[in-house]
From Swiss-Prot:
<feature type="region of interest" description="Disordered">
    <location>
        <begin position="494"/>
        <end position="520"/>
    </location>
</feature>
<feature type="compositionally biased region" description="Basic and acidic residues">
    <location>
        <begin position="62"/>
        <end position="97"/>
    </location>
</feature>
<comment type="function">
    <text>May negatively regulate the SNF1 kinase.</text>
</comment>
<feature type="region of interest" description="Disordered">
    <location>
        <begin position="1"/>
        <end position="46"/>
    </location>
</feature>
<feature type="compositionally biased region" description="Low complexity">
    <location>
        <begin position="383"/>
        <end position="393"/>
    </location>
</feature>
<feature type="region of interest" description="Disordered">
    <location>
        <begin position="383"/>
        <end position="406"/>
    </location>
</feature>
<feature type="compositionally biased region" description="Low complexity">
    <location>
        <begin position="577"/>
        <end position="597"/>
    </location>
</feature>
<dbReference type="InterPro" id="IPR039301">
    <property type="entry name" value="Sip5/DA2"/>
</dbReference>
<feature type="compositionally biased region" description="Basic and acidic residues">
    <location>
        <begin position="542"/>
        <end position="574"/>
    </location>
</feature>
<feature type="region of interest" description="Disordered">
    <location>
        <begin position="314"/>
        <end position="337"/>
    </location>
</feature>
<feature type="compositionally biased region" description="Low complexity">
    <location>
        <begin position="663"/>
        <end position="675"/>
    </location>
</feature>
<protein>
    <recommendedName>
        <fullName>Protein SIP5</fullName>
    </recommendedName>
</protein>
<keyword id="KW-0963">Cytoplasm</keyword>
<feature type="compositionally biased region" description="Polar residues">
    <location>
        <begin position="645"/>
        <end position="656"/>
    </location>
</feature>
<dbReference type="GO" id="GO:0005737">
    <property type="term" value="C:cytoplasm"/>
</dbReference>
<feature type="region of interest" description="Disordered">
    <location>
        <begin position="705"/>
        <end position="786"/>
    </location>
</feature>
<comment type="similarity">
    <text>Belongs to the SIP5 family.</text>
</comment>
Amino acid sequence: MGNAATKESRSSQEHSARHSRGGSTASTAAYDHYRPSDGIHASSSRALRGGRSDFALLGLGAEREPVEHRRETRQEREARKREKENAARIKERQRSMKEEHVDGGYLVTQGVYVGTEDFNKAIVRQLMIERRLAPFWRGLNDFSESWTEHQLMAAARGMPIPAPDEVPPELEYKIPSKSSAEKQPPERNLNTLMVPITSRSQSYNSDTSSINRTISPARSPGALSPTNSFLRGRAKTLASLTTSSKTPASDMAPRELQLPKDPFVNGQPIEAYLYKDASECPICFLYYPPYLNKTRCCDQPICSECFVQIKRPDPHPPEHHDPNNSETTHPDEPEGQLVSEPAACPFCVQPEFGVMYTPPPFRRGLAYAASPGVHALANSSAASSASSLVSGGANPGTRRRAVSISADSPSVITTDRVRPDWATKLAAARAQAARRSAAATALHTAAYMMNNPGGPGEPRRRGMLRRTAGQDSPGGRTAPSHVNAMAYLAERRVVTDRDNASPVDSTTNLAPPRASSRRSRIDELEEMMMMEAIRLSLAAEEERRKKEEKETRKEAKRREKEAKKAEKSAKKAGLDSQNPSNLTSSTSSANSAVQTAGGANSELDMSANKGKGVDRSEPRPGVSTEAGSSTEPPKITIKDLKGEQFSSMLEGSSKNMHLRHVSSASSSNSSLVESAFGESIGSGTPHNGSSSSLAAIHGFRSLAAMIDDTPSGDSGESMNRPGSTNEQVQGAPAVKEPSENSAPNEPDQVTLLSSSPSLEQKDTLGKEVHMSSAEVLPQSSLGTAS
């Protein structure tokens, strides 16, 4: 891979050297350096170059473009920037902690929070040097009131805590005597307790320098007269005033000075003096010196590192804005803009969070020359300064303040003070939102208001919008979508603007003024949301109504189905209860008719054969009359059955039997009956003629002739005595009275049953007819129908 890259680089260099005009010697030397000296390699390289030129003529040997470096993304750029800031912060922290401090505290953070430090470091530094904000104390993870001085020193310096009776060599200290302090040269006091020479004014420098300067022998003694020096000093002062007025305000900031380095306070090391009464920060839970910031509202302690992390929320729409808070409400601001409420207290949630700081009763480290009492506190001893400031300073063990201090107080430092760019960020966010709103307004105008409302394109566009809305919305025509709502609002807005504007302005001003556009957009948005809510409510109500109607129809269908099923079952049960009674009554009538006819024929045959020429026809009517008057009804023949009673009986039985299916048992019975009675019963000959009745009578006579000869008396007794055998029990349903299940519209059957013989004239033929009576009637009905 490396060789290929080298060849490409060489070929590119050779190509550039070959085609360049007036090339420098450096390029020629480079070309000679890369040219091979060997003949074989030279020939091969020439052949290769020739081949490459040939490829170039064909367009195949074009040189590759140099690979472009991948552009750095925004995330990578921000990550690299954060890494650089962290490295610079660590370096500055090490330098500041080594060289600078304020009353034993530091001017840089101690790494409790690892996030970005977006507060103004210059302002925080100035407030700490002015002793209006607590310095960044070093926090202790653990603290015990029984610790000794060297243990407190080790904890404050970040060293491992030694044993109480063990003093490490690096923690040994020796209190300096006053004589050594008095022997310090005045130049050191001048440099440490006063403003440095470079930072003094020009008049002050000139005056002091003229005093220390030796008198030149060329000058006359009169040059140093008081009058001349006064005039010259006055001129210098006026010049300094005029020049200082032209300097920028940043150069007028107070100058820092280094107070004398005294590591002891009241005979104790400064670390032991600070941390002997350590207090815990309720937010980061680290132990600090008792000289912490106190909240202005609830007088709660808070360290500076936690305080600088509290800030205003990012700019956001006013939905979450508290309308009850009158302090943050500005009537001059237009509605609908982004807002950013002041930070609230983390303890009592009171807005305009601010802190107050009471410094310790000594001064060490950096200070400003313009601050009052700096020199007095620096020159005085620790004991005298402590005794003089006990009355004026706040003791950490005093009673907590119960009155809230106003956020406008000079001693209160708010979160907006350490982040003065919050207004700039809010303005930038509002400007960005305004640009977005303007872009949205332009799109809105281009989409809905650029066309002439009265032109031919307006109805088409409106119809297209409505058609699109009908396709998108599930409700179709009944449920308008947000597109219809927007079109309606735009149309109404155009009509309103056209009515309010003059005829001349209506053609030029397509959009409302910028001042009122935001308000109108908010109104339109609210109306659009209201219309959408109404649409959703109507759609929900329509869906609920459709669902309810569907449930109602389903319930009605179910009830109808159940009613049909109940009616069908009731009809089936009614038919089952009616058919056996009708069939039994009809079959009993037929049996009685057939038995009566058979009995009459047998009596005729017996009377003709048994007698010896004696004509017994005369007394027969009398005997039959007696029997009919006593126990029997009148005799009925087949011809008599051809009347209305028999026809109605057959029609009723056929009508009832047509509703039932023929079972296998009934088919077997019908076959048995047909074999017993012959072809005359199941034949297809019509029953309404005399031949059919004669054939039936002939069949019954042949059956009677087959009976063995018996005495006339026995036969008469057997024919005339009441039946008390099993046939009587089996024929009991045939002689029953008409039941309640029998149809009331069949009076013939009732008459026939009432006129049938009751348990009289039973015979074997009658038994067979009774057994097969269930199939005799359908055959007769079919024969009648045919």
